[in-house]
């Protein structure tokens, strides 16, 4: 049978719910970004440290790099689709089987060598303070085929979605150079339109009539599913899990952003200025409590 090319549209009604697909163990706490690149086609961040295990994985897969995809408009920029729903963008986290193979180049020659985690980006009304750390680096790689040190404290865990149930299937890398097992989180993370538009100002490696060309879009259209391709889901299929996030109460959203900002300050200054860091984490706890009671009140109001 022909190889299943990626990306694909995942039809939830055809996905096979498999309770044996246990939660993943994600160990990104020790991952550190080393460099950020404009490859002329996408943004790539190289990492040192970090790995995933558990779930259906036979052993640890080491994090290698992060790739970002987007479109001309905010309503379509993801490679993969869920029930034909198009997300604003997509992050791909590439891992390789270090226990079994000696290098990434060796691992990608085998169908159990690569694991790619997909995280969807959904444009909303507020900025993502963690994603902003990537956006802040883009000016240093505006030209095609350039790279720069990633000179900001960055915790990849903060870009994980709130729910980690996942779809999985055997496909290929986006450029079809190797087989890859895909792990796709249907729950997106929210970013602001201004953050995504910054990626469209990067220069492409291709020129048009001698003039600079921008990477206005770089997503790939989905391929038809082969007859023998199976898509599995790590839990009970719930259609609502794949629908776009509803708009939240504005004030609660603002409080949530403020809490994330305070937590970001805590992480940044814990070594440099402990007093400031302690004040920041106190605000995090206070805002968390406020959000908790407001969400309970909001839930009761909806029920009534």
From Swiss-Prot:
Compartment list: Virion membrane
Record GO biological process: symbiont entry into host cell; virion attachment to host cell
Post-translational modification: Apparently non-glycosylated.
Principal cellular location given in the protein's record: virion
UniProt GO MF annotations: carbonate dehydratase activity; zinc ion binding
Cellular component terms per the entry's GO annotation: membrane; viral envelope; virion membrane
Ranges of residues in domain Alpha-carbonic anhydrase: 1-235
Cross-referenced InterPro entries: CA_dom, CA_dom_sf, Carbonic_anhydrase_a-class
Tree of life domain: Viruses
Virion surface topological intervals: 1-275
Record SMART domains: Carb_anhydrase (SM01057)
Residue ranges crossing the lipid bilayer per the database entry: 276-294
Keywords: Disulfide bond, Host-virus interaction, Late protein, Membrane, Transmembrane, Transmembrane helix, Viral attachment to host cell, Viral envelope protein, Virion, Virus entry into host cell
Segments in the Intravirion topological domain: 295-304
Induction section of the entry: Expressed in the late phase of the viral replicative cycle.
Membership in a protein family: Belongs to the alpha-carbonic anhydrase family.
Subunit record text: Homodimer; disulfide-linked.
Physiological role: Binds to chondroitin sulfate on the cell surface to provide virion attachment to target cell.
Name listed for the protein in its UniProt record: Cell surface-binding protein OPG105
Protein species of origin: Vaccinia virus (strain Tian Tan) (VACV)
Name of the gene this protein is made from: OPG105
């Amino acid at each position: 049978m022909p190889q299943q090319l990626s990306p694909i549209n995942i039809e939830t009604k055809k996905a096979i719910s498999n309770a044996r697909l246990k939660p993943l163990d994600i160990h990104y706490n020790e991952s550190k970004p080393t460099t950020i690149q404009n490859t002329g086609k996408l943004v790539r961040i190289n990492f040192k440290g970090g790995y995933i295990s558990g779930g259906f994985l036979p052993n640890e897969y080491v994090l290698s790099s992060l790739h970002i995809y987007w479109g001309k408009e905010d309503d379509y920029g993801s490679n993969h689709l869920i029930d034909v729903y198009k997300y604003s963008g997509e992050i791909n986290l590439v891992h390789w089987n270090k226990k079994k193979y000696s290098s990434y180049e060796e691992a990608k020659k085998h169908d159990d060598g690569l694991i790619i985690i997909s995280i969807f980006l959904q444009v909303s009304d507020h900025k993502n303070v963690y994603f902003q750390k990537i956006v802040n680096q883009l000016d240093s790689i505006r030209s095609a085929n350039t790279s720069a040190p990633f000179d900001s404290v960055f915790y990849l865990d903060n870009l994980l979605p709130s729910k980690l149930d996942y779809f999985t299937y055997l496909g290929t890398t986006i450029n079809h150079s190797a087989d890859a097992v895909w792990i796709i989180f249907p729950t997106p993370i929210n970013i602001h339109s201004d953050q995504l538009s910054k990626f469209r100002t990067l220069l492409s490696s291709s020129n048009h009539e001698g003039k600079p060309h921008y990477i206005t879009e770089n997503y790939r259209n989905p391929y038809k599913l082969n007859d023998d391709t199976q898509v599995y889901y790590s839990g009970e299929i719930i259609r609502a899990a794949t629908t776009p996030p509803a708009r939240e109460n504005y004030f609660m959203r603002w409080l949530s952003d403020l809490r994330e900002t305070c937590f970001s300050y805590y992480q940044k200054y814990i070594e440099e200025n402990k007093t400031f860091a302690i004040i920041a984490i106190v605000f995090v706890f206070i805002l968390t409590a406020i959000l908790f009671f407001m969400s309970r009140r909001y839930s009761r109001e909806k029920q009534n």
